[in-house]
């Protein structure tokens, strides 16, 4: 889980590498493009990531400036991945005891 708020941006990203692909996307872009970049490609990136890595990913974000909103989503996502893959101790990081 990576969650943060700034002056005008709120975002939350939850990630689970549990072997099933699922994307919950609650982000509404108010522009089709940021410069030459189609904003719809942001969701496409995360959907493709979920499919290829078989993870559950939930992204909720809102804000005014679409460029900064996309940056905030990717930053929260990167923090989430860093926490998810960090090795701590020797125990298996699973409530079921297996991965």
Go through the PLM ranges and name each one.
Residues 1-5, 9:
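Single conserved hydrophobic/aromatic residue that forms the stacking wall/gate
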Residues 10-14, 18:
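Beta-strand-rich assembly/attachment modules of structural machines
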């Amino acid at each position: 889980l990576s969650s943060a708020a700034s002056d005008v941006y709120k975002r939350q990203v939850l990630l689970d590498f549990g072997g099933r692909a699922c994307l919950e996307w609650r982000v509404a872009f108010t522009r089709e493009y940021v410069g030459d970049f189609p904003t719809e490609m942001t969701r496409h990136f995360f959907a493709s990531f979920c499919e290829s890595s078989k993870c559950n990913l939930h992204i909720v974000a809102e804000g005014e400036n679409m460029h900064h909103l996309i940056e905030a989503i990717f930053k929260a996502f990167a923090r989430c991945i860093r926490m998810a893959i960090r090795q701590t101790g020797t125990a298996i990081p699973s409530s079921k005891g297996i991965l």
